[in-house]
C-alpha cells in the first residue's frame, strides 16, 4: 500500500475555490463518506453520556452533551474538517480527521463525563455506589453513533484516498 497517498495536500487546499464544492456525485463511496461525516457533526450535539439512577423509590437522571466536553469540541472541529475534505476531494485530510473523530468518540464512549447530580459533580464512584443500592441505567448513545459514523467516514475516505475502486451502483 502506498502510504504517500495518505499525506494531506495542504497546498491544494490553499488553491481551492471554496464557492464550488467538487464532490463526485456519481461516486457512491464519496457520498457515503459525506453523509457519515455530516452525521458525525450532528451526533456531537447528542448526549454522549446519560445516567438514570432509581434508588429508594426516587428517580434521578443526568446527561451531558458531547459538545460540552473537550473531546466533543475537538470532535466537532474534526468532523467539520472531514466534511470539507470529502466535499473538496481532499480524501487524505478527511481520512485523518475522521480517524481523530473515531478516537474521540471512543474516549467519549468509555468516559463518565462529569455529570451534575443534586447540584454536585457525580463521579464514577458515585455511580457505582448508587448501583449497589438501586437500578442504574447508563447510556452512551451519542458517543456510539458518533464513533460509528466517524468510522464509516474514515473507511470510505481511506478507500477514496488510496484510489481503491469498488463498484457500488445504488442507482
Say what each PLM segment does.
Residues 2-171:
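Compact integral membrane and secretory-pathway proteins
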